[in-house]
Amino acid sequence: CSSKTRYAYTFWDDINVIDKEQIENWQPFGSVYDFFYEINSNNYFVPCNTFRACVENYRFAKINNGRLMTSMGNWKTPYTTSFTAFKSYLNSRLWVNVNYDYADLEKTFFDHYYGDGGVYMKKFFDEMTSYMDYMRDSGNADFNGVVVNEFTYTAKYWPIKMMQRWNNYCDLALKEIEKTKALNDGTYEALHDRILMETLFPRYIICKYHAAKFSETEIASMRKAFYDDT
């Protein structure tokens, strides 16, 4: 598929009619190998809102003689922020069965992947995707899921108070998993790293696009902490 496909939408949506017809026209000739994109290749720190749409796109590929479905992720970057881990989980399930219910997959992931911190991480995720859905549905082309898009990297799209609130959810999630330290079996470390990973997106936005709101000493300290955690 084209890198200009709007992956925040499904192939059933009118905005992707050209790509939809392209796949449909190929399928009579044999097995179709689908290559979709689920990242913003300009900047891995900024989310690409394909979570729900990818489920329908897997189903579309399946009914159009799809034999192999590949979702492009982050090259040689196994641990990435913006809930990329959830995308990997969705792909792993949908590769097996395209009929899985999205809501069930979402619940299973957030109930387990972040341990007791999952409640706050789900809150972060819900606010993030709802905001991006709103921006997309308001007709803002910068949020339509095109894989090559540098236009979402501005302070106006990511207000500092929103970024601080999302980062605070991660802090609250980290507090929730403190009790697992007593297990002394690596559980705490695994959960800690998974939650810390999701702080990178809001912290990156704050450090890069809201730096003027802090003193030179403050922003230098914040950037060093960000660097140390990546």
Q: What is the predicted function of each stretch?
A:
Residues 64-65, 90-230:
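Catalytic domains of carbohydrate-active enzymes that cleave complex glycans
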Residues 2, 6-9, 14, 144, ...:
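Active-site lining segments of carbohydrate-active enzymes
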Residues 6-123, 127-130:
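Structured mid-domain segments that build the active-site/substrate or prosthetic-cofactor binding neighborhood
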